[in-house]
């Protein structure tokens, strides 16, 4: 079996023409550019706004966490200081330095006819103490026991002694 190829006898040096290039889709090109431009125009501000919002949220979170931490420590120290300051009683020596007097007769200067610690009335000749800062009056034995445990007035919770900087605790008022 043999194959024959027809030959016309001419030799041509020109290459056969290449197929034409495919036509570019010029109708969709402006729409694509416009679409990409609008996406960039919208997405960049949205991304920047979201980034700023996240940073602001984190900043507020850290600020309030730090503020809460400081307040909690401050309240804890204040509570501990107050508990130490008011719950610790006075020394017997300090209590003995408080003003005392013998009860003679009912008077408005004593504030009442009863000692609020023992809920008993004042009697003629009993020793009493008048607290210097608030002026409340109690039986001497009652208030002495109270002040050894707690350094404040049993009625108004005012401190019996005032702390002055650079000095030790000292009673206020005169000592009788």
Swiss-Prot record:
Pathway: Protein modification; protein ubiquitination. It is found in: Membrane. It is an enzyme of class 2 (transferase). Its EC number is 2.3.2.27. Residues 1-26 are annotated as: Disordered. GO terms for molecular function: transferase activity; zinc ion binding. The chain crosses the membrane at residues 37-57. Its main location: membrane. Keywords: Membrane, Metal-binding, Transferase, Transmembrane, Transmembrane helix, Ubl conjugation pathway, Zinc, Zinc-finger. One of its GO terms (cellular component) is membrane. It is a single-pass membrane protein. Induction: Up-regulated by chitin. GO terms for biological process: cellular response to hypoxia; protein ubiquitination. A zinc finger (RING-type) spans 115-157. The RING-type zinc finger domain mediates binding to an E2 ubiquitin-conjugating enzyme. Belongs to the RING-type zinc finger family. ATL subfamily. This is RING-H2 finger protein ATL14. It comes from Arabidopsis thaliana (Mouse-ear cress). The lineage of its organism: Eukaryota, Viridiplantae, Streptophyta, Embryophyta, Tracheophyta. The gene is ATL14.
